Amino acid sequence: MSKVKLGDVAEEVKETYDGKGNPAIVGLEHLVPGDIRLKSWSTDTDNTFTKAFHKGQVLFGRRRAYLKKAAVAPVDGICSGDITVISAKQDKILPELLPFVIQNDDFFDYAVGKSAGSLSPRVKWSHLKEYEFNLPGMDQQRQLANLLWHFVDAKEAYEDLIHQTDELVKSQFTGNVTGGAA
């Protein structure tokens, strides 16, 4: 395991949208605090976004970093200028592991500490790239990424089960109340 800086293993992507196609459109409102997967976006083309991103890249909400908004993109699209697009240097870090480096309390604490501005603090890539963390070799990265994504899948399945149970209870309660009133 070796200590590395984020900028040694990942880079900020500054790609401009070419205007072709019907991209997914991501604003800060689509990044859910604590969620590592981007699950919603817009297709409304009435916006001024020009920053392009691609499937597998990490979208980091650089404005108000204390909100802990960062997620891996499941599709290609365009995003707000208040989102930093981060891509793994694949010979240094597995793209599947990078989202977990970004979506963690230590990284967010670092980002908040480097943010500037009072009403709407923002953090720059020039500061984020200096974030240091321990990184294992590629074989261990593969094992770790696999394990972490299994945890994410299990957590999401559990949350879905809770939601379905809530809906079932609501439907039973509604049925009993309306059925009993007739």
Regions found by a protein language model. Give the residues of each.
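A short glycine-rich beta-alpha junction/loop motif
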Residues: 63, 77-84, 117-139
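Non-catalytic DNA-recognition/assembly elements of restriction-modification systems
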Residues: 1-17, 130-146, 150-182
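Sequence-specific dsDNA recognition surfaces
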Residues: 7-55
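A short beta-sheet element
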Residues: 50, 58-103
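Short aromatic/basic micro-patch
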Residues: 25, 60, 122
